Amino acid sequence: MSKNKLSKGQQRRVNANHQRRLKTSAEKADYDDNLFGEPAEGIVISRFGMHADVESADGEVHRCNIRRTIRSLVTGDRVVWRPGKAAAEGVNVKGIVEAVHERTSVLTRPDFYDGVKPIAANIDQIVIVSAILPELSLNIIDRYLVGCETLQVEPLIVLNKIDLLDDEGMDFVNEQMNIYRNIGYRVLMVSSHTQDGLKPLEEALTGRISIFAGQSGVGKSSLLNALLGLQNEILTNDVSNVSGLGQHTTTAARLYHFPHGGDVIDSPGVREFGLWHLEPEQITQGFVEFHDYLGHCKYRDCKHDADPGCAIREAVENGAIAETRFENYHRILESMAQVKTRKNFSDTDD
């Protein structure tokens, strides 16, 4: 390879810097302070590239530009913004976001090129939605629970589409959900189709800022349609007949207000919740039932697998820890290692 030829990684960085300079040049003349009114408090309802929809104290939503000094802005951020004044030609000027208040929490997901990417801010509850279709995946539930424990945000597990279960199926699903009930997690069984179980869900959402999370096709948008009412209807898509997987419908995270009180952030569906940016120790801490056994293994560097004298494995064998959870713990660690290997390979200069 020629010494003067740029690698793929170097080309990405050059292109990114070029685009950044173009944006900076384009913005310099755009934000004249005389075009804006007095500062006010607001909350980001949604983010679209270099613009954001900001809701003011009176409930009005304003499309705003974003000061280039603001490095990160996501749905749920509480901000200081200024409304745009009417221009001389009678054309309204967009408002502008001036500053972002300190966040109480931020939900992130790993990204190959951008590191850790924020999704939503100031949430105090993550609603983990699962369903028997496209499949009841305890592995995905466990991934979200690890994320909740790492963020120290309270989780709520919601199993949707229970109207599709017969008595035998309901018994099986309850047995699976008891794994989580037995370690202190709250589980609600609902149907967005028949609206069974929606009242307890409404109560759990009241007074909270929640985000609905889960793989595509589990009915997040259908649940939100039922909870929000037709006037706020969100697009939905059925499970694909070909793949059995859900088809993504929501394209940008957006905050909605429930009629019964409380807010929700609807975010794009994901088929797998990435945790590869975390350390293995954080994954271990994310399994709450492990806590009583940590520090009691025979060896300090115990991997909690086939190591002799592993207190966690002994707890699994004794029935104190669910075998399914223990298996998912190792699946998560294995998937993290695989993704990190791929990332390191892609970052290697050609």
UniProtKB/Swiss-Prot annotation:
Q: Report the EC number(s), separated by commas if there are several.
A: 3.6.1.-
Give all residue intervals belonging to the CP-type G domain.
Answer: 104-273
Question: Which keywords does the record carry?
Answer: Cytoplasm, GTP-binding, Hydrolase, Metal-binding, Nucleotide-binding, Ribosome biogenesis, RNA-binding, rRNA-binding, Zinc
* Gene Ontology terms: cellular component: cytoplasm
Q: Where is this region: Disordered?
A: 1-27
Looking at the keywords, is GTP-binding present?
yes
Record-listed Zn(2+) binding positions: 297, 302, 304, 310
Record text on cofactor binding? Binds 1 zinc ion per subunit.
Question: Entry's InterPro entries?
Answer: G_CP_dom, NA-bd_OB-fold, P-loop_NTPase, Ribosome_biogen_GTPase_RsgA, RsgA_GTPase_dom
Similarity annotation: Belongs to the TRAFAC class YlqF/YawG GTPase family. RsgA subfamily.
Subunit structure, as described in the record: Monomer. Associates with 30S ribosomal subunit, binds 16S rRNA.
This chain's function reads: One of several proteins that assist in the late maturation steps of the functional core of the 30S ribosomal subunit. Helps release RbfA from mature subunits. May play a role in the assembly of ribosomal proteins into the subunit. Circularly permuted GTPase that catalyzes slow GTP hydrolysis, GTPase activity is stimulated by the 30S ribosomal subunit.
Q: What is this protein called?
A: Small ribosomal subunit biogenesis GTPase RsgA
Q: Which organism is it from?
A: Salmonella typhi
